[in-house]
Amino acid sequence: MNRNQAIIASLCYFSVFIAPIIVPIVAYFVVNEKETKRHAIRSLISHIVPFVGWLFLFIALLGGAVAIDGDSLLPVFVIIGGAVIYFLVVIGIIIWNVIQGIKVLRAA
């Protein structure tokens, strides 16, 4: 992998901050190098995971809002617990993307 391809691959990981899904898709279809495509797919998957988690959290929020009654606080704790777990996973994914982006740049 040459320097330019390493920069493109690292941009796929760093795009978690700006245009998370668009940059890896564009890199995958524009670049012909196999290693850069592999990094684009890995970063795309890591960018899609928080979106899917957000959908589950949103569905749980809607279901919890319907299930809340005056006697039980369980749905509230489930929603808050789900949100905390979601945000911890998102922070972990962001850290993983930054580490992978730095690794790709250092390897080049």
UniProtKB/Swiss-Prot annotation:
Keywords of this entry: Cell membrane, Membrane, Transmembrane, Transmembrane helix
Superkingdom of the source species: Bacteria
GO CC list: plasma membrane
Compartments where located: Cell membrane
Recorded topology in the membrane: Multi-pass membrane protein
Transmembrane segments: 10-32, 45-67, 77-99
Coarse class of the protein's main subcellular location: membrane
Species of provenance: Bacillus subtilis (strain 168)
Protein name, as recorded: Uncharacterized protein YvlA
Gene that encodes the chain: yvlA
